Amino acid sequence: MLTFLIPTAKEMVIPKESYPHLLPQPSQAILKAMAAMTTEDLAKSYRIKEEAAKKEQQRWQDMASQQSLAYPAYQLFNGLMYRHIKRDKLTTQEQAYLTQQVYITSSFYGIIPANHPIAEHRHDFHTRIKIEGQSLKSYWRPCYNQFAKEHPQVISLLSSEFDDVFSKDCKQLWISPKFMAEKEGRFKTHSTISKKARGAFLTACMENNCQTVDSLKSLVFAGFYYHPDLSTDHEFVYIKKEA
């Protein structure tokens, strides 16, 4: 069985379905540290204006006082990649695939199933904060490595900020898809192409119930197709031809 890892997103939209917010134990220390920060501290930590930091401070205070609601993560996050993932009108098989084989890597919650209930928050591995004297990456590394050991065959749709959260020896069987546009024999890639393609790729995997590495090579989605000559055992390259 394939396991997919996807990142979080800054952009969020509130779904209709909500739950009580239950925070995993490792996240408690992060919440305590974030809730204790002033608006000025948060502005520096996030590298945002104080006006925007006030909104984030209120979110942390609400979580600390157990006033926050929680929402299925894959529905709450609404960044470009998420908007290209099929999230509505799923078949029973697609719903099972999304909730059992797709995991979200979070600097606040750890690695969680795609449908895990989470609260509105802003947090990533670039957030300037120490937890128990450690960087966020060092703090989470044991949990992340344990997940990797339990799920050796991972399809990583993660961005570069996660490269050194996992130890290298945990990623020996990982495959990272790469998405490129071809025009007049030249190949290019950028974040917009990649984010849209990640969502379309995951949707194609769900719809085709891909369970083996070889099945990924036959996928065709949003104009992309597998390119064997540019691919390696650990990097599958998908090309889309532009007019």
From Swiss-Prot:
Alphabetical GO CC annotations of the entry are: cytosol
The Gene Ontology biological process annotation of the record reads: response to hydroperoxide
Residues in coiled coil: none
Signal peptide, first to last residue: none
Q: Tell me the InterPro entries matching this sequence.
A: YaaA
The record's similarity note reads: Belongs to the UPF0246 family.
Protein name, per record: UPF0246 protein MGAS2096_Spy1821
Organism lineage reads as: Bacteria, Bacillati, Bacillota, Bacilli, Lactobacillales
